[in-house]
């Protein structure tokens, strides 16, 4: 009789826009030799799928009707993962402004969140690694509330604005800050990602550089899991 596969250790990472969730989570996964799952990519991919077909992403019924045919796949290698809808590689396309503009509306639909949460759990279970770093907005409270390690990664708003504007050539800190505030305000209607839930450890990177932040996250993992 075949023994059931041991489920991976899960590091769940939440946080506001511009907190460095994606870059820090990928780096931590790489150093730990774990898989990595960017849950936000699924919402972006669904937004792309709706917009690409000329449908209205602001109409919840339209978005819900798109779910059965939404053939989504994502890799879990932190260094080389790609995002596909059907056979089309949309890794870059889902970062386009037209997609970013509709993501919050897509993510506010309860049926979408429920469907994608089920998908995320399937991906986590089949990751094939000893552990997986899962990052997003509601990972510590909804997707993986029982994760062995749960972290809220945050930083002061001014720091988040400056970091994001440095990533986006030609965008002022003020413009980026306004975009971050709007996105956080829209997403906070659905889930509280600004405050750590019970049992969630806060890592504040306001005074830390990138490498120090990754070190801090790994230190939490080592303390909680003894890896």
Curated annotation (Swiss-Prot):
- Please name the SUPFAM superfamilies in this protein's record: P-loop containing nucleoside triphosphate hydrolases
Keyword ATP-binding in annotation: yes
What positions belong to coiled-coil segments? none
Q: Where in the cell is it found?
A: Cytoplasm
EC assignment = 2.7.4.25
Task: State where ATP binds.
Answer: 15-23
Q: What Gene Ontology terms describe where this protein resides (cellular component)?
A: cytoplasm
| An annotated GO BP | pyrimidine nucleotide metabolic process
Q: Per the record's keyword annotation, is Cytoplasm included, yes or no?
A: yes
| Swiss-Prot/TrEMBL catalytic activity | CMP + ATP = CDP + ADP; dCMP + ATP = dCDP + ADP
Listed Gene3D superfamilies: P-loop containing nucleotide triphosphate hydrolases (3.40.50.300)
Q: Which UniProt keywords apply?
A: ATP-binding, Cytoplasm, Kinase, Nucleotide-binding, Transferase
Paired cysteines (S-S): none
Pfam families with a match to the protein in the record? Cytidylate_kin
Name the family the entry cites.
Belongs to the cytidylate kinase family. Type 1 subfamily.
Its recorded name reads: Cytidylate kinase
Organism of derivation: Leifsonia xyli subsp. xyli (strain CTCB07)
């Amino acid at each position: 009789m075949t023994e059931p596969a041991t489920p991976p250790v899960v590091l769940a990472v939440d946080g506001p826009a511009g907190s460095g969730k994606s870059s820090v989570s990928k780096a931590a996964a790489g150093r730990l030799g774990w898989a990595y799952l960017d849950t936000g990519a699924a919402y972006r991919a669904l937004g792309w799928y709706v917009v690409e077909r000329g449908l209205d992403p602001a109409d919840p019924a339209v978005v819900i009707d798109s779910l059965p045919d939404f053939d989504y796949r994502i890799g879990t290698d932190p260094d080389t993962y790609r995002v596909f809808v059907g056979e089309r590689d949309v890794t870059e396309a889902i970062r386009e402004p037209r997609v970013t503009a509709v993501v919050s509306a897509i993510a506010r639909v309860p049926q979408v969140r429920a469907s994608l949460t089920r998908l995320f759990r399937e991906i986590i279970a089949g990751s094939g690694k000893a552990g997986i770093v899962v990052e997003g907005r509601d990972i510590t409270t909804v997707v993986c509330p029982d994760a062995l390690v749960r972290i809220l990664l945050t930083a002061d708003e001014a720091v988040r604005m400056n970091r994001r504007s440095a990533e986006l050539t030609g965008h002022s800190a003020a413009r980026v800050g306004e975009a971050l505030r709007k996105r956080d305000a829209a997403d906070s209607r659905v889930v509280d990602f600004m405050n750590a839930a019970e049992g969630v450890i806060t890592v504040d990177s306001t005074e830390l550089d990138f490498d120090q932040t990754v070190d801090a996250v790994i230190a939490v993992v080592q303390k909680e899991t003894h890896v």
